[in-house]
């Protein structure tokens, strides 16, 4: 009986986590479909604004500026995707691609040939050095539980997360 309970619990939890990891969080948007522009400033370990209200089906252009003194990331994902991405970011630090206040783009390009994740060329994310600007155009296809976060090692853990409310 215990074994059956364990198997049922395992299958339930596994399907819940698997669904979260594979939930469609949206898709790369087209400039011609942009509903509105949201300007975002990244400071050292927080975003301004700290939350976003978005309607299902909206295509948003995020204009992101890093006003902090550290490298920061603006990444649209669910919690499981952030957890999966964090070891990739740690690997970038370990390989001296991602430094405290800069990104070694030559090393990044070289490493990306061996490991695509090291190129950090995700359509849902922008990684910026201090004083840099970038943008993401994202279509929010459905109401899912997502957040914007910085996955530079330690930043997510100290709360560099912005709530995304999709309705």
For each predicted feature, which ranges?
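Sec-dependent N-terminal signal peptides
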Residues: 4-14
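Extracellular/periplasmic metallocenter environments
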Residues: 20-27, 46, 69-71, 103-112, ...
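N-terminal edge beta-strand
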Residues: 30-60
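Beta-strand secondary-structure signal
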Residues: 37-39, 61-63, 135-137, 147
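Asparagine-centered strand-capping/turn motif at beta-strand->loop junctions
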Residues: 64-68
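Beta-strand signatures of extracellular beta-sandwich domains
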Residues: 73-77
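Short edge-strand/loop segments of extracellular domains
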Residues: 78-84, 166-167
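Extracellular/luminal beta-rich ligand-recognition
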Residues: 87-108
């Amino acid at each position: 009986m215990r074994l059956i309970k364990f198997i049922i619990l395992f299958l339930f939890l596994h399907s819940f986590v698997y669904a979260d990891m594979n939930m469609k969080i949206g898709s790369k948007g087209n400039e011609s479909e942009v509903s509105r522009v949201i300007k975002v400033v990244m400071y050292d370990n927080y975003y301004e604004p700290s939350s976003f209200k978005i309607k299902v089906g909206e295509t948003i252009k995020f204009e992101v500026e890093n006003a902090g003194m550290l490298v920061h990331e603006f990444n649209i994902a669910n919690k499981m995707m952030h957890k999966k991405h964090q070891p990739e970011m740690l690997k970038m630090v370990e390989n001296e691609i991602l430094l405290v206040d800069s990104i070694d783009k030559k090393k990044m390009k070289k490493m990306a040939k061996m490991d695509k994740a090291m190129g950090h060329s995700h359509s849902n994310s922008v990684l910026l050095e201090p004083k840099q600007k970038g943008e993401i155009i994202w279509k929010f296809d459905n109401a899912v539980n997502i957040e914007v976060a910085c996955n530079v090692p330690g930043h997510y853990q100290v709360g560099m997360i912005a709530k995304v409310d999709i309705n």
